[in-house]
């Protein structure tokens, strides 16, 4: 009873009463002593008007063993931790939850984030306020013991060693991660010079995931699984293929890159390397952008490649992982952003920050480059190629549409299928309509063969 009254007083911020009742809890039971200790630690945190540097150092002096606690490795065939182990972990988590909330409320967004998340979770919902606060923390010369603890515990990327088949951590500097993060955001915003400036700060050995691993394939006819060792894959920073400037002939995320992506005009730009780091990619885009400003056939091709890049890196594109801080284009939560209303994970702290990725596609950069390419070229084959690329962006806009008429039609989709199709044709098929004028081109026939949407359109409208 006295323990419960002490806890209720704590929640009501009656700290003197909390201390009075806690002093009366004299049971020698391990469970009671553990619960009493939890309330004592929470009381110590609650009494702080602000979590200061001196208090952070004090926390680590008194409670380092609690904060550094990790579950022990279980023996083979044992699947549950002991009650004592669970109590230790619960105590650690309670302390971190309270601290996370306090940091959130006092505006220390960087530490509020790191308490509950590995740094790479920032890629699920990029937030400049958190990024800038982490940048201040990184540049702070006299970090507290608790700040050092957070950086050491959270600035890493959980990975899998495919050779040993064991989980592992990839360690890197906070400054490298933040420069990569900011540079990637700038790249998506077409701020190429700012992106380059950030990428130049990075140790070029930096990476956040493995570049070599097994690819598994299941043969349903033989009912056997095979695995192939692949190397030089995207590792979060390196090995970006030059095909990122190509276009996808077919819609298939799990198909081989060579089967999906075609690369017209790419070999005319020798400065684009076959595999690139983000810095090398940015340098190539800066050069392409310079050429794209002219009014020549070469400029048209440069604009076309840039337009492809910005479509390919939307969540509809084959290389959707690049600007979303993902490892590959598998169907992860960051790419399920159509049809649902995004909800913030919490209004109290940043726990579970990685759930519910929030990426809203912007098709304007791709469309602007492609329209410039269309206006700059006299080549009919290329014009047809560009219209097909524009039609993909137009389809993306259809997915993004918040049109109230369309929303009402979808409320009874089964009965309104014909009306939905008519709405789509009237409002989101202008590039298909224009592409029909290029039926005498080679690329037109290729598009009809590969894209069943377009094939259906040409046969019915």
Where are these regions (language model features)?
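Extracytoplasmic/secretory-pathway proteins
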Residues: 2-461
């Amino acid at each position: 009873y006295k323990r419960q009254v002490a806890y209720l007083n704590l929640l009501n911020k009656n700290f003197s009463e909390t201390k009075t009742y806690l002093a009366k809890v004299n049971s020698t039971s391990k469970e009671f002593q553990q619960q009493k200790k939890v309330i004592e630690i929470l009381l110590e945190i609650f009494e702080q008007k602000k979590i200061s540097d001196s208090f952070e150092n004090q926390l680590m002096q008194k409670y380092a063993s609690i904060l550094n606690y990790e579950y022990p490795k279980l023996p083979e065939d044992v699947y549950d931790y002991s009650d004592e182990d669970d109590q230790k972990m619960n105590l650690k988590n309670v302390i971190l939850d309270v601290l996370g909330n306090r940091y959130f409320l006092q505006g220390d967004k960087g530490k509020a984030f790191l308490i509950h998340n590995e740094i790479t979770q920032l890629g699920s919902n990029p937030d400049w306020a958190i990024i800038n606060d982490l940048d201040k923390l990184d540049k702070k010369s006299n970090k507290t013991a608790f700040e050092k603890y957070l950086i050491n515990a959270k600035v890493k990327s959980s990975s899998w060693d495919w050779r040993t088949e064991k989980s592992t951590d990839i360690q890197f500097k906070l400054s490298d991660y933040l420069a990569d993060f900011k540079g990637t955001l700038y790249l998506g915003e077409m701020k190429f010079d700012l992106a380059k400036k950030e990428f130049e700060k990075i140790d070029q050995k930096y990476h956040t995931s493995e570049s070599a691993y097994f690819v598994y394939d299941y043969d349903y006819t033989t009912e056997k699984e095979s695995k192939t060792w692949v190397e030089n894959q995207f590792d979060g920073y390196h090995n970006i293929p030059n095909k990122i400037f190509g276009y996808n002939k077919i819609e298939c995320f799990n198909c081989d890159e060579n089967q999906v992506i075609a690369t017209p005009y790419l070999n005319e730009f020798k400065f684009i390397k076959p595999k690139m780091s983000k810095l090398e990619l940015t340098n190539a885009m800066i050069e392409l952008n310079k050429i794209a400003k002219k009014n020549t056939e070469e400029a048209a091709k440069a604009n076309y490649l840039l337009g492809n890049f910005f479509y390919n890196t939307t969540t509809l594109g084959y290389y959707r992982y690049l600007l979303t801080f993902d490892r590959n284009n598998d169907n992860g939560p960051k790419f399920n952003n159509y049809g649902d209303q995004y909800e913030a994970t919490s209004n109290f702290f940043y726990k579970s920050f990685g759930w519910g990725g929030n990426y809203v596609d912007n098709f304007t950069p791709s469309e602007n480059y492609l329209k410039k390419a269309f206006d700059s070229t006299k080549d009919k084959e290329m014009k047809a190629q560009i219209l097909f690329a524009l039609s993909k962006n137009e389809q993306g806009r259809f997915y993004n549409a918040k049109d109230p008429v369309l929303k009402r039609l979808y409320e009874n989709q089964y009965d309104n299928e014909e009306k939905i199709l008519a709405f789509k044709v009237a409002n989101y098929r202008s590039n298909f309509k224009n592409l029909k004028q290029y039926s005498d081109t080679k690329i037109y026939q290729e598009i009809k063969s590969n894209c069943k949407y377009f094939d259906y359109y040409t046969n019915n409208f």
